[in-house]
Amino acid sequence: RLGMLILSGDITDKLSWMVQYELFTSQLLKLYACYKPYSFFQVKIGRMKTCFTLENQMSPSVYETVNFSRVIERLAGFSGDVCGNQGGRDMGLQVGGELFKTSVDDYFLEYRVGVYNGSGLSMKDHNDAKDFAAWFTVQPVKGLKMGASAYIGKLNDDYTVVNDETGEETIYN
């Protein structure tokens, strides 16, 4: 079962917010503010999807399958990950943007870089270390995107559980 309450809005033309609440599990999934002064630069702060893999950052409503691929479930903080099922989300600060517009909705380069607590949906940080993620894609021809991402972090109090991941992706539509 899945039921979501999603609220979002614009405070100004450059400042927006979003809240996403899962009704059946009573879990707050997203709560962030986003400042976007330019298309090439935005800053997000709060609870959000981490910028690891293209699929993790997409809305489930655009998938051609029922759920995430097994690879993303393992790598991006879903079931089977060392962090447990965190929905690919965490608390943190993320910067990113799009560069070199090629058409109405397309850009040659997209990027995101984030610093996160590393504790997933939990509000409590498990250690003093922060996790880092980076993602970028290039679109050399219309419809073809190629990219790479990396996630570097430590999970538990004594820093013995390493959560370092890398990925590459190609999508054509």
PLM region spans:
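Detector for outer-membrane/organellar transmembrane beta-barrel domains
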Residues: 137-173
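Outer membrane beta-barrel
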Residues: 1-121, 126-133, 137-152
